[in-house]
Amino acid sequence: DQGIRAFQQGNYQKAITLFQQAVDANKNDPEVLIYYNNALARKQGSPFTLAVVVPLDKNQDDRNNGKEILRGVAQAQEQFKQKNGLNGRLLEIVIANDSNKEKAKEVAQELTKDSSILGVIGHNSSDATRAAIPEYEKAKLAVISSTSTSIFLNNPVFFRAVNSDESTGKTLAEYTYKTLKKAVIFANPNSPYSNSIREVFTNQFEKLGGEVVRKPLIDLTASTFDPEKEVAKSVYANNAKAGAALLFPDTRSTNIAINTAKEITERNKTLKTENPPRPELKMLAGDTLYTNETLTSGGNNVEGLIIAVPWFRETLQAKSFAQKSARKWGGDISWRTATSFDAAQALIKTLSNNATRDTVLRGLENVSLTASETSGYPLRFTSEREREGQSILLEIKGGKFVEITPSQL
């Protein structure tokens, strides 16, 4: 707090000293590292300013996601400083907190009013991003999300540093259809993310010749939802007989999805003992279940779960960045840190001596980053401002996430 006070009073040297102490004491905290680098940038003079919008309120999952995003942004800011910025000008990062979609719109309005802000990284959820985009469009302010994957987000100022649900849903549909022809979907109908990935999966699966039973979905969030009953119905009902269960919770209903996985695992034990034995119900999911929480609270019940993700620290391409980051933060990083680093790198690439919101927005369209400038995979945008590239499939084996390599497909 003293550091923040010194910074606000323009006493940057004092702020630098205080934030340096805070950084040394909290190696894992990206916020203090950003404040430290902001103070250095101000002291140096004429910093370039970008904003990052993350949820930093009471909800622990949201806070964790927010911190993961900030780690990626802090790492890019730090790297820019180590290269002495651009002609000696460093980067200042404004951190804004949006814990819900109402707040997201307000935050976007505030950021657009600050004319020094050249670009925005955010928001975390597709819900929040959707609420905020119209404000950025009015101000012609580029926004690049590293975590919002919904296909319903499309705007001339909106870019994505993460694969959209188009890529994830398609990958899951193709993988499922290779071995199973009937699928059931558990999702939250009120979430743009859940709806988006469900729609892509359904369209693609049906196009291949598969059938989604109990359409359009089983609502995980309904007050009457009974996982045991719904799983049994999906397997046994004459018009169902699903072979695959797709779990598409939003970030707020992941615990219900993990409970559902538990019921599927229980049901699979019964299916094996039937005469004749019935094949097990295969579980698949999107990236909302790609968390340590899934492994710890799911335990044996999530064994065999297949998840499509945007980035995985064990792949050949990601290893070098993942190891460097783990040393920096004192522990493994998540995909959110990787894609947020990439989002910040894309914005940094557009900076020039006389950068304006307009030059940044136009620059993003032509950004091309090599694998050595990102978290491991090249970054280019399609004409729709989507990130080029494929989702990665993982399986939970022995309580760990393991890559399903293309040769295993």
Which residues fall in each region the model found?
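Extracytosolic ligand-binding ectodomains
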Residues: 1-409
